[in-house]
């Protein structure tokens, strides 16, 4: 990884899962910001320089879809990974998440690989710039 340390925002209302992902991502050299609710996650997203988001689908209050929708509205190019206990991809998530993983089945190394891929894909995409200035 380059000299810039990527920041990953993890959002989950279940503390054990949140801490496991925090330790996993920090061990790989990422800076991790944790939020314990969708609303807290949105606040953190707005106040921190976040490079990617890993969030739980099923949270009380604001679920993962609502959080992903708001993140897409605020900063459309942010990579989003949604974790869910449910294996089926819901139609409403299409276009909101870059990756959908079934919670509990993924190996920790697999999550790291996928986070790295999301960040690499983002880095290789041309960054959306301001609209061209027509003189």
Language-model features, listed with the residues they occupy:
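Non-catalytic signal-transmission and effector/linker regions of two-component phosphorelay proteins
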Residues: 1-7, 109-135
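Conserved acidic segment of CheY-like receiver
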Residues: 5-16, 21-25, 53
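Charged phosphotransfer/docking patches of two-component systems
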Residues: 15-19, 90, 108
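Helix N-cap/capping motif at the beta->alpha junctions
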Residues: 34-43, 64
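Short amphipathic alpha-helix used as the core "switch/output" element in two-component signaling
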Residues: 43, 65-76
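Active-site residues of response regulator receiver
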Residues: 56
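Receiver (REC) domain active-site loop signature in two-component systems and cognate sites
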Residues: 59
């Amino acid at each position: 990884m380059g000299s810039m340390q990527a920041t990953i925002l993890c959002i989950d209302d279940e503390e054990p899962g949140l801490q496991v992902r925090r330790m996993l991502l920090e061990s790989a050299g990422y800076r991790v910001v944790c939020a314990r609710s969708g609303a807290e996650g949105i606040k953190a997203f707005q106040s921190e320089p976040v490079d990617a988001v890993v969030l739980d689908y099923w949270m009380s209050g604001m679920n993962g879809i609502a959080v992903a929708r708001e993140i897409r509205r605020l900063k459309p190019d942010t990579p989003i990974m949604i974790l869910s206990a449910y294996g089926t991809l819901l139609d409403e998530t299409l276009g909101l998440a870059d990756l959908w993983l079934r919670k509990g089945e993924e190996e920790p190394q697999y999550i790291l690989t996928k986070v790295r891929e999301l960040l690499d894909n983002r880095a290789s995409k041309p960054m959306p710039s301001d609209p061209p200035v027509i003189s």
